[in-house]
């Protein structure tokens, strides 16, 4: 089904070209979102100093913990909307849209309140050094005031992705990203507002992107048109969104808790190592966006084809996504490894900080294709409506391995290099478990659909 030039027909025609057409804007959108934070880091690091850089970086894991639960729930909205849209269920599609946008607004307000009230407590819990904690608290509190806008954009974009439209969300992020860059330069360099200026620039850019995506839904003439008078929670659709979204959100949140533990281990090396990890982690994030784009493509394509019972096409979606993910991540990972020092110099001129950043990149870039495979299998399962078991396996494989590594092995081998070997080890173990799970679920789904069609 295709209603306008922005949408992609996921259920008919060749696959690889459509996956690329869908994934590329999604990948660029993710990179632009990362650039919001990257601009903060670069401008603050260059014009305010390494302590301010460490302050901004120390909030990243915590921000991800707070946000990823609710962003994970938006995946449930994406899966449900894709299924209803492909099968032509217009009433159900409309109810899903209005429930999702209402949920986004409520989630954003809750997160804003929690972030403002709990910032200092959470940062102290992570062992943030005294020389940066005040700036970290200030940045985090201001940043979280923009959470309602952040959530509205993400849920609105999830609806557009469900119908095959990834181009307009990209356009919206180009506009808001340019605004963010200009505001950061003005507020930090001209008005000397430090970390506060970086956070304010991000809030304004998120406000703009949320207005644009809501306007897009409001002016649509399709089943996903937004009527503000219809906003509200419909329990039956909320349950279905939660069925897929909550396990995905919990998985993402718990994995980020393990990253917060890892951040605490990095903090024990001091502010120089923290700054190096901050810069390297930002580069690392660009790799993740390539993985995440292909994973979300796999989930959306699988969900639409599941809605119209095209089982063979679902299998082909996973295979083509696997080829695409491995190719992209190997290329980008090798590039990040070989050009690591040059990339880190964009963020800071401090030689010690660059050295620490290179140490982190050495064990996380080239093997990153394993992370892509690890994420694709649960993505395909969520597209079929199965989210609980992949969550449990990901937590055991990823989080369990890192906890054992940090508390069991790391104390006897204290170095950044040894700390970050835990990443590829956890990816490989999780792939093995997810592959077994996928085979069982795929067999069950095929049997169930074939019975329905008989």
Language-model segments: residues:
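Residue-level signal for short hydrophobic patches within transmembrane helices
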Residues: 12, 16-35, 39, 62-69, ...
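Hydrophobic alpha-helical transmembrane segments in multi-pass membrane proteins
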Residues: 22, 26-34, 71, 103-112, ...
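Short alpha-helical transmembrane segments in multi-pass integral membrane proteins
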Residues: 1-23, 81-146, 190-246, 302-367, ...
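Small-residue-rich hydrophobic transmembrane alpha-helices
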Residues: 53-113, 150-169, 276-334, 338-340, ...
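Hydrophobic transmembrane alpha-helices of multi-pass small-molecule transporters
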Residues: 65-68, 180-184, 210-214, 286-289, ...
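Transmembrane helical elements of multi-pass membrane transporters/channels
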Residues: 21-40, 142, 176, 205-209, ...
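Short runs within selected transmembrane alpha-helices of multi-pass transporters and secretion channels
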Residues: 74, 143-161, 169-180, 198-211, ...
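Helix-terminus/linker motif at the lipid-water interface of multi-pass membrane proteins
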Residues: 35-54, 123-130, 186-193, 253-286, ...
């Amino acid at each position: 089904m295709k209603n306008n030039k922005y949408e992609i027909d996921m259920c008919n025609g060749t696959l690889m070209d459509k996956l690329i057409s869908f994934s590329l804007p999604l990948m660029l959108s993710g990179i632009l979102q990362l650039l919001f934070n990257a601009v903060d880091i670069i401008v603050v690091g260059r014009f305010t100093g390494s302590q301010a850089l460490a302050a901004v970086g120390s909030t990243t894991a915590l921000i991800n913990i707070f946000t990823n639960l609710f962003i994970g729930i938006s995946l449930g909205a994406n899966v449900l909307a894709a299924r209803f849209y492909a099968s032509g269920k217009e009433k159900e599609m409309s109810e899903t849209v209005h429930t999702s946008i209402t949920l986004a607004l409520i989630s954003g307000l809750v997160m804003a309140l929690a972030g403002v009230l709990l910032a200092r407590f959470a940062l102290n819990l992570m062992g943030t050094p005294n020389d940066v904690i005040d700036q970290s608290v200030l940045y985090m509190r201001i940043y979280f005031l923009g959470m309602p806008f952040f959530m509205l954009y993400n849920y609105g974009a999830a609806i557009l992705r469900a119908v095959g439209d990834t181009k307009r969300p990209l356009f919206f992020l180009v506009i808001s990203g340019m605004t963010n860059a200009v505001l950061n330069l003005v507020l930090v360099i001209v008005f000397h507002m430090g970390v506060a200026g970086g956070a304010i620039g991000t809030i304004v850019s998120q406000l703009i992107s949320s207005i644009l995506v809501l306007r897009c839904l409001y002016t649509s003439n399709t089943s996903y048109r937004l009527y503000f008078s219809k906003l509200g929670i419909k329990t039956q659709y909320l349950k279905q969104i939660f069925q897929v979204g909550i396990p995905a959100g919990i998985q993402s949140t718990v994995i980020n808790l393990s990253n917060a533990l890892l951040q605490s281990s990095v903090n024990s090396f001091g502010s120089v190592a923290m700054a190096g990890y901050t810069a390297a982690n930002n580069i690392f994030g660009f790799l993740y966006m390539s993985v995440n784009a292909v994973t979300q493509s796999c989930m959306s394509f699988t969900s639409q084809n599941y809605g119209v019972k095209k089982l063979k096409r679902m299998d082909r979606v996973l295979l083509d996504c696997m080829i695409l993910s491995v190719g992209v991540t190997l290329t980008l990972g090798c590039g990040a490894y070989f050009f690591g020092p040059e990339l880190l110099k964009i963020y800071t001129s401090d030689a010690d900080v660059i050295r620490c950043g290179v140490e982190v990149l050495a064990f996380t870039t080239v093997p990153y294709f394993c992370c892509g495979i690890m994420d694709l299998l649960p993505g395909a399962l969520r597209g079929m409506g199965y989210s609980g078991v992949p969550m449990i396996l990901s937590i055991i494989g990823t989080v369990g391995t890192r906890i054992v590594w940090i508390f069991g092995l790391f104390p006897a081998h204290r170095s950044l290099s040894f700390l970050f070997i835990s990443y590829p080890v956890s990816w490989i173990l999780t792939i093995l478990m997810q592959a077994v799970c996928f085979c069982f679920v795929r067999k069950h789904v095929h049997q169930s659909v074939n019975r329905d069609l008989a």
